[in-house]
Regions:
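Short hydrophobic/aromatic patch on the recognition helix
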Residues: 1-5
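Alpha-helical structural elements of signaling/regulatory helical domains
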Residues: 7, 33-36, 54-57, 71, ...
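Alpha-helical structural segments
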Residues: 10-33, 39, 43-50, 61, ...
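All-alpha amphipathic helical-bundle segments outside canonical DNA-binding/catalytic cores
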Residues: 39, 78-82, 99-115
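C-terminal peripheral helix-coil segments that are non-catalytic and often amphipathic
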Residues: 47-54, 84-100, 115-161
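Amphipathic alpha-helical segments used for helix-helix packing
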Residues: 54-74, 127-134
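Internal catalytic or translocation cores that form aromatic/hydrophobic pockets or channels
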Residues: 65-69, 73, 77-93
Length: 161
């Protein structure tokens, strides 16, 4: 490990870069600029939902990184740079939605990203405790589809408010 990465900390930074790189690279392939604003938001929400649902290890590692106050993310310019792509894409969607009268003015793309990520991330990061406490199977197909639709609806209602 030390031969290739120098330290276990650097290995961890590279794992984070790989995981964040995977989501950011795939987001850039969604062709959001080619879609109408409402459809683009649907695609972002559905992609984020499915990505988190299918990449539980990503969610776990992000949770662990937050326990450590983001110390390893701070070591990576790559993660920050690649993460700007989704913010620019959301900024473009918001601008087009405002211009067409579909979305209200004044929504910040980082706030929108936080909202989408929060809804999609929480149901995975807390799935065991939430499922047990409220006796719901968050991993059932019926519940997943219901939650995906609910999140799309909530985000779009926020944008149209």
């Amino acid at each position: 490990i030390y031969y290739y990465f120098g330290s276990k900390e650097q290995l961890y930074v590279e794992v984070l870069e790989k995981l964040y790189g995977d989501i950011r690279n795939t987001e850039s392939e969604l062709n959001l600029g080619e879609l109408e604003p409402v459809e683009a938001i649907h695609r972002v929400v559905e992609f984020t939902f499915d990505h988190h649902d299918n990449n539980v290890d990503f969610v776990r590692i992000v949770c662990i990184e937050n326990i450590h106050n983001g110390e390893n993310v701070k070591q990576s310019d790559t993660i920050q740079a690649k993460s700007q792509n989704i913010i620019r894409a959301l900024e473009d969607i918001l601008r087009r939605g405002e211009e067409s009268g579909e979305f209200r003015a004044g929504v910040h793309p980082i706030d929108l990203h936080l909202m989408i990520s929060s809804f999609c991330f929480y149901r995975i990061s807390n799935r065991h405790t939430f499922s047990e406490i409220f006796q719901i199977e968050l991993w059932s197909d019926e519940v997943k589809q219901r939650h995906k639709a609910m999140i799309c609806d909530a985000v779009l209602r926020y944008l149209k408010a």
